[in-house]
């Protein structure tokens, strides 16, 4: 499925979604796994 690596000032998180939560300073790197 599509997974996004969501980076913030608190660390890196992986979400099994097509995008990261908006409006919280996340950077998005998505890939198909």
Curated annotation (Swiss-Prot):
Molecular function in Gene Ontology: ion channel inhibitor activity; potassium channel regulator activity; toxin activity
Disulfide topology: 6-30
Primary subcellular site in the record, as a coarse category: secreted
A Pfam family that the UniProt record links to this protein: Defensin_4
Any coiled-coil regions, as ranges: none
Protein name: Toxin BcV
Sequence similarity: Belongs to the sea anemone type 3 (BDS) potassium channel toxin family.
Keywords, in A-Z order: Disulfide bond, Ion channel impairing toxin, Nematocyst, Potassium channel impairing toxin, Secreted, Toxin, Voltage-gated potassium channel impairing toxin
GO cellular component: extracellular region; nematocyst
Subcellular location: Secreted; Nematocyst
InterPro entries, per the entry: BDS_K_chnl_tox, Myo_ane_neurotoxin_sf
Protein's job: Potently and reversibly blocks mammalian Kv11/KCNH/ERG voltage-gated potassium channels. Acts as a gating-modifier toxin that shifts the voltage-dependence of ERG activation in the positive direction and suppresses its current amplitudes elicited by strong depolarizing pulses that maximally activate the channels.
Superkingdom of origin organism: Eukaryota
